[in-house]
Structures are given as C-alpha cells and as structure tokens.
C-alpha cells in the first residue's frame, strides 16, 4: 500500500505517511464496531450462498442488501477470500455472527481496499500547484494535502472503528477528480459512472459532473469573455460520454433487467419509508428544523398547550428508523426535501455553466452539491459529510479562504459522528485522534498561508472552541444530572444542532466565495 511514493530530497515521505496510517488502522482492529459490521457480513453471506436472482429479495436478516450491483459483486469477490478465514460467516442464517477470524477478515478487507484511496491521493497531489511550497518538507502543499487525506480523522473512525468501506469509494471519487485536473475527461467520467454503481449516494454530486462535462468537454472552446462558443460543440464527445454511461449501467443493471428485477433493486436502493432524519440526527437543516419542533413541543406540554395523547408516538429521538410526524411544525415529505435540495444546488450549477473556472470550479460545484444534499436530503447519515470534507481538502491548500472553510467544515463535520462511538474504551481514542488531526490541520494551513490574513475571525474561533465545553457537558456532566432520565435525547440534540450551525455556516461561506469569483476570461482549448 505504501508503494506509491513521491520522492522529495531523497526521502520517500508519501510512503511513510501511507505506511504509518496503515499501521494505525491495524491497531484499531480490536475496537468497537457498529451494526454495519453485521450488515456487511450478511451481504457476504447473501452474495456467496444465494443465486443472483435472490440477492435483492433475501430478507432473513433486517440488514438487507441495499447497495447497487457493483457493490454486491464486490462483496461476492470478498466472500471467496472470506471462506478461507471462517466458512460460517457466509451462512445467511448465522445472524450476528462475529468470530475472531471474521473480525480479522472484515477489518483487513477495509485496510486492503484502502490501497485505491492511497493511489488516488497520490494522483491528487500531482494536481496541486507548488508555488506556495516552503523550504521545509512539512510546509509543502503536497505534503499537507497528503496528510489531510491519508490521516483523515473522519475516515479513520467511520471505516476502521465504526466499520464501513468509504475509503476505496472515496478513492474512486478523488481519482475521478484528479483525472479532470489532468484533462483525462473520459477516464474521469468512466470512474464516476463506476462509482455510482458502487454506492448511489454519489448521485448527489452527479449534477456537477454532468454540467462540467457538457460545458468544458463537449464545448471545446470559449469566447474571450468566458461565454460559450456555441459552434465548438462536439457531438462525438457527447456520444462518447453517453456510451460510457450506457455500457457501465448495462454491465451493472443488465443481469437484473434480464431477470425483470429492476423495480425490486430500485425499491431497495431508495427506501423512502425511512424517516426524514436518521436515528441520530445528521447535523443539517432538518436537524435545526426538528430541534425547533422538539423545543416547541416541550414548551407546549409544560404550558399544557398540547395534549400528550395527541403527540405522535414515533419519536425522532427514540433511535428508531421509521416514519414520524412532527408535533408542531409541518411534517416534511421526501418530495419537499428533493425540491429543497434541487433549489440549493441550482446556484452552484449555474455558476459552473456561466462562470467556467476549469477543474477547480468543478470541484467547488461538486462540494456545494454534496453539502446541499447533506443539508436538505432525506434520511441523511451524519457520515455523509465526508462526501464534502474529502474533496474540500484539495481546495484547502490553494487559497486562504478555502482553507478557512475547510477547517470549519472538517472540525465540525468530524465532531458530529462522536455519538456513534459511545463505548467507554473508544472515548480517549476518538478525542485524542481528533485533537491531533485538528491541531495539525490548523497549524499546517496557518503556516502555509502565514503571509495572508488570519484564517479565522473572532466569531469562528469562539464557535470552534465551543466544541470542547460541549463534549465535556455531553460526556462527563449530563449523565450525572437529573435530566438524564427525563430528557435522554439532550446530548444528541445539542451535538447535532451545534454542528449543524457550523456546517451551515461553512456551506454559506463557500457559496458566497463561489458566487463572487469572476469567470476565467480567456479562450481555452480542452
């Protein structure tokens, strides 16, 4: 995994960074894992022991297969290695099976597939402008970017403690972005098409890909003022892109189309019967909306303005994944969230079309699409913030304003999954790892932009420092108060709402910077 190196002054520092974080991942193998561990074990069993015609129908476990076909084939491939570790993990009826060999296999499968992420980071480093490079290795943008991505705290806790496979999926996305910077548009489009059929959450950033490829690849030239030169449109390029999407989709969905199972597959991929918010509210607009509704309902009950018998039984803080009704405010439907998400994305997509800024403009639009979907999407998971945090790392080493936005977004976004790791042994691990990553991120970017104005104003500094008292209250004070029994949801509510404020601020600040940036005003041949 550490084979991808960038030699600087005779030292293979990239390999050292990759090897170091790999060793840390190995040390995290015995830590707590969530129900996602059983989810993926069950998918191994389904794809290994059942014919393809039953993959999206099997429901022995509540953790049914709900990822696109490429991920199902990925699990199928892993299962043929898993059988040499413990054959019993591949039995569909062995629910909640977790032997020591199963643990080792699943943990190492995540570590091994992270090789793609390492390679993608290596390729992204090639796209970084080295003009700001300092004399010291640790002050070079490529070194800072490598550390921010390879040692990303969010990926470490979500993949290697909580348990998921975000590393190699993020690697596909970063590699696709790198190919655009390298003007290898067809390859970038192919990688993204493949990624969509691994995990459909990346549909959120598809508008950025579609508009950028149409504007900057299918149209081969601009006028002097940056507007489109309409006679430069290439039908050949458009057909080539369409062919890529068609062939990848046919390879993924073709077998299920032949089995007349596409409706069943899509019903698994888009389960709208789940509630607006996850069991733990993702820190987005709907968390603020739901928290306001919760406050109004508590006040209404205390003042006897609401009838307790008429309050919906499906509580948003019960930890259950189900549909629910808001108590005071109007309940939100999937259609409403879709419309809000679309409206939130439109300005960024409009800027990408009307104010082309090359791959960097595409990257900004991608991040805004990811954040807009996070802010207003249906049943958003708190872990989805990584979809914006990781690509934002690339912007952070380019401009001071982007570094400021990145630090606010990543610090807040990384703190928000803390409630996922609720066991005592993981408490010092998550606190120490986040502190180390946050301190490094702030200090390295401050050094990189030391000749410019401070990265934070007083309000931003005060907000970020507030995460410390919030953690102390939630972990060490609240459990010993009388409110713990009557209002057990308060720590989750406070964490979600506080982080939602920071993420909303970062989203708005990035939007402002995109809207005021001028277009690239010269003709460019792609």
Curated annotation (Swiss-Prot):
Catalytic activity of the protein: an alpha-D-Glc-(1->3)-alpha-D-Man-(1->2)-alpha-D-Man-(1->2)-alpha-D-Man-(1->3)-[alpha-D-Man-(1->2)-alpha-D-Man-(1->3)-[alpha-D-Man-(1->2)-alpha-D-Man-(1->6)]-alpha-D-Man-(1->6)]-beta-D-Man-(1->4)-beta-D-GlcNAc-(1->4)-alpha-D-GlcNAc-diphospho-di-trans,poly-cis-dolichol + a di-trans,poly-cis-dolichyl beta-D-glucosyl phosphate = an alpha-D-Glc-(1->3)-alpha-D-Glc-(1->3)-alpha-D-Man-(1->2)-alpha-D-Man-(1->2)-alpha-D-Man-(1->3)-[alpha-D-Man-(1->2)-alpha-D-Man-(1->3)-[alpha-D-Man-(1->2)-alpha-D-Man-(1->6)]-alpha-D-Man-(1->6)]-beta-D-Man-(1->4)-beta-D-GlcNAc-(1->4)-alpha-D-GlcNAc-diphospho-di-trans,poly-cis-dolichol + a di-trans,poly-cis-dolichyl phosphate + H(+)
Record-level GO cellular component terms: endoplasmic reticulum membrane
Transmembrane portions of the chain: 4-24, 103-122, 143-163, 188-208, 238-258, 334-354, 368-388, 389-409, 427-449, 461-481, 488-508
Subcellular location field: Endoplasmic reticulum membrane
Name of a matching Pfam family: Alg6_Alg8
GO MF assignments: dolichyl pyrophosphate Glc1Man9GlcNAc2 alpha-1,3-glucosyltransferase activity
Enzyme Commission no: 2.4.1.265
Protein purpose: Dolichyl pyrophosphate Glc1Man9GlcNAc2 alpha-1,3-glucosyltransferase that operates in the biosynthetic pathway of dolichol-linked oligosaccharides, the glycan precursors employed in protein asparagine (N)-glycosylation. The assembly of dolichol-linked oligosaccharides begins on the cytosolic side of the endoplasmic reticulum membrane and finishes in its lumen. The sequential addition of sugars to dolichol pyrophosphate produces dolichol-linked oligosaccharides containing fourteen sugars, including two GlcNAcs, nine mannoses and three glucoses.
Official protein name in the record: Dolichyl pyrophosphate Glc1Man9GlcNAc2 alpha-1,3-glucosyltransferase
Lineage: Eukaryota, Metazoa, Chordata, Craniata, Vertebrata
Gene: ALG8
């Amino acid at each position: 995994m550490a084979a991808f190196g960038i030699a600087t002054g005779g030292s293979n520092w990239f390999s050292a960074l990759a090897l170091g974080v790999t060793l840390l991942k190995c040390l995290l193998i015995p830590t707590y894992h969530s129900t996602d561990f059983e989810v993926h074990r069950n998918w191994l069993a389904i794809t290994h022991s059942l014919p393809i015609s039953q993959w999206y129908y099997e429901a022995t476990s509540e953790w049914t297969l709900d990822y696109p076909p490429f991920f199902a084939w990925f699990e199928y491939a892993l299962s043929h290695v898993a059988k040499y570790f413990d054959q019993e993990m591949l039995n569909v009826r062995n629910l909640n099976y977790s032997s020591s060999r199963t643990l080792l296999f699943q943990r190492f499968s995540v570590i091994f597939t992270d090789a793609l992420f390492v390679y993608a980071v290596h390729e992204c480093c090639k796209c970084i402008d080295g003009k700001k490079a300092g004399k010291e290795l640790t002050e070079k943008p490529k070194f800072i970017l490598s550390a921010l991505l390879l040692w990303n705290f969010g990926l470490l806790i979500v993949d290697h403690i909580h348990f998921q496979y975000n590393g190699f999926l993020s690697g596909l996305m970063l590699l696709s972005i790198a190919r655009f910077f390298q003007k290898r548009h067809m390859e970038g489009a192919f990688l993204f098409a493949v990624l969509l059929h691994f995990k459909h959450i990346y549909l959120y950033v598809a508008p950025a890909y579609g508009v950028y490829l149409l504007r900057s690849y299918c149209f081969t030239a601009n006028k002097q003022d940056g507007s489109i030169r309409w006679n430069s449109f290439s039908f050949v390029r458009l057909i080539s892109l369409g062919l890529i999407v068609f062939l990848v989709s046919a390879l993924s969905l073709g077998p299920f189309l032949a089995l007349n199972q596409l409706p069943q597959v899509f019903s698994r991929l888009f389960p709208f019967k789940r509630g607006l918010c996850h069991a733990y509210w993702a820190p987005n607009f709907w968390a603020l909306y739901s928290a306001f509704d919760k406050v109004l309902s508590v006040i209404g009950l205390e003042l006897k303005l609401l009838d307790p018998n008429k309050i919906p039984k499906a509580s948003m803080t019960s930890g259950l994944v189900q549909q629910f009704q808001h108590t005071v405010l109007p309940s939100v439907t999937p259609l409403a969230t879709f419309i809000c998400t679309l409206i939130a994305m439109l300005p960024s997509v409009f800027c990408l079309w009307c104010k082309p800024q090359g791959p960097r403009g595409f990257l900004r639009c991608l991040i805004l699409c990811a954040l807009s979907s996070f802010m207003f999407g249906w049943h958003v998971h708190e872990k989805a913030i990584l979809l914006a945090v990781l690509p934002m790392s690339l912007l952070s080493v380019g401009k001071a304003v982007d570094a400021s936005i990145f630090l606010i977004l990543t610090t807040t976004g990384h703190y928000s999954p803390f409630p996922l790791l609720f066991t005592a042994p993981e408490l010092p691990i998550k606190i120490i790892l986040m502190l180390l990553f946050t301190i490094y991120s702030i200090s390295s970017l401050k050094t990189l932009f030391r000749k410019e104005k401070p990265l934070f104003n007083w309000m931003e500094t005060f907000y970020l420092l507030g995460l410390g008292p919030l953690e102390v209250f939630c972990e060490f004070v609240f459990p010993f108060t009388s409110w713990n029994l009557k209002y057990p949801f308060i720590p989750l509510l406070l964490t979600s709402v506080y982080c939602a404020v920071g993420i909303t601020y970062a989203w708005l600040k990035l939007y402002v910077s995109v809207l005021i940036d001028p277009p690239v005003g010269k003709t460019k041949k792609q």
